[in-house]
Design a protein with these regions (language model features):
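Walker A (P-loop) phosphate-binding motif
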Residues: 16-43
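Hydrophobic residues at beta-strand termini and immediately following loops
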Residues: 55, 146, 205
Length: 227
């Protein structure tokens, strides 16, 4: 992709020709290692002369804290949470990503609209509706889909944060235990990500490899996109 374009109608007043930076997305299920790789990529890119902005879900000034409080209460419906996340994304797009891209930054984002769409669909949202919700999003230059099997995710999650209520799909009552619910929920998310791979041009990276091997793979691929 030479320049930027929106999936549908973008925010008003944005001149795409002014966006000279690069938008790079790391996607994948919970516990796959996205945040670890972004923490490695940021200083690597900076050492190679690139200004870098890192962003991710629930980090907007407008909606980030509200989403975290809503998740603690477990009371909002799936569609309401979907729109809450869309608000967070829209705020970050307008006030973080677009200004950084206009200034020539490399924007590294830990998940993008694909996670938000996948989660919404798994929770019963109509796929066409949720895609229209995010039609204002910029098409990234590249999306790296870190993919691994469920059996590799479980030990990673257990050794980091443990089973989270939302990341285990506990609100959907998919299993008798948090473990069973996590396995079923993440399996459904994997199915959605796999279905998005071709239409959204994901580059699939096997995330079952070591952190160093995945990082080297990303370095090689990103270098080719920045040349």
């Amino acid at each position: 992709m030479a320049g930027f374009e929106f999936y549908g109608e973008g925010p008003p007043g944005v001149d795409l020709e002014e966006l000279t930076g690069k938008l790079i997305v790391l996607e994948g299920t919970d516990g796959v290692g996205r945040s670890t790789q972004i923490a490695l990529l940021k200083p690597w890119l900076e050492n190679h002369g690139h200004a870098v902005l890192v962003t991710g879900m629930t980090r907007s000034a407008l909606a980030g804290d509200g989403i975290k409080r809503a998740k603690e209460g477990h009371t909002l419906s799936g569609s309401t949470m979907s729109l809450f996340y869309a608000t967070d994304f829209a705020d970050r797009l307008e006030n973080e990503m677009i200004p950084a891209l206009r200034a020539g930054f490399v924007v590294l984002t830990d998940r993008y609209i694909y996670t938000l769409m996948a989660r919404s669909i798994v929770r019963g949202a109509d796929p066409d509706w949720i895609r229209k919700v995010y039609a204002f999003a910029l098409r990234p230059h590249v999306v790296y889909y870190l993919r691994t099997q469920i059996e590799h995710l479980i030990p990673r999650v257990l050794h980091s944060t443990g089973f989270d209520f939302w990341e285990s799909g506990a609100d959907l009552r998919l299993g008798e235990t948090m473990y069973d619910s996590f396995v079923e929920y993440q399996t459904r998310l994997l199915k959605q990500f796999d279905a998005m791979t071709e239409p959204f041009n994901f580059e699939v990276i096997g995330a079952s490899k070591s952190i160093e091997q995945v990082f080297e793979d990303l370095q090689t691929r990103i270098t080719s996109h920045l040349e």
